[in-house]
Regions:
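Ankyrin-repeat alpha-helix packing hotspot
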Residues: 27-28
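A contiguous binding-surface segment within folded domains or other stable secondary-structure elements
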Residues: 105
Length: 105
């Protein structure tokens, strides 16, 4: 279950890699964990990956001028990170199914 989450830090915080914290935790951490576990998931008879998203993802409004930190709006990063998480789940499910694995995302 990918359910790590950061919601609306008061200021833009970047990871050591320069990734905005909300995106790093809400999207990239679950994505990387799932990729790292893919081999084990593919060997399991009925593996499942659950991504916990948010209803807020239905209203993304991120523009590129908000990505540099000068016009930081935490809510927009939260919304788009959760949308990206849901989109990633759809794509990973397609990839696992196309490869003939029973993993459900």
């Amino acid at each position: 279950i990918n359910n790590a989450g950061v919601m609306m830090p008061a200021k833009r915080i970047a990871t050591a890699d320069g990734v905005e914290l909300t995106w790093a935790v809400n999207y990239f951490s679950g994505f990387m964990l799932t990729l790292r576990l893919a081999g084990l998931l593919e060997k399991a008879p009925a593996a499942r990956v659950v991504n916990v998203a948010s209803i807020a993802m239905g209203n993304p409004q991120l523009t590129f001028n908000q990505c540099d930190g000068h016009n930081y709006r935490p809510w927009h990063f939260y919304i788009t990170s959760k949308l990206a998480q849901a989109m990633m789940a759809v794509k990973l499910n397609q990839l696992f199914q196309a490869a003939g694995h029973s993993v459900m995302v």
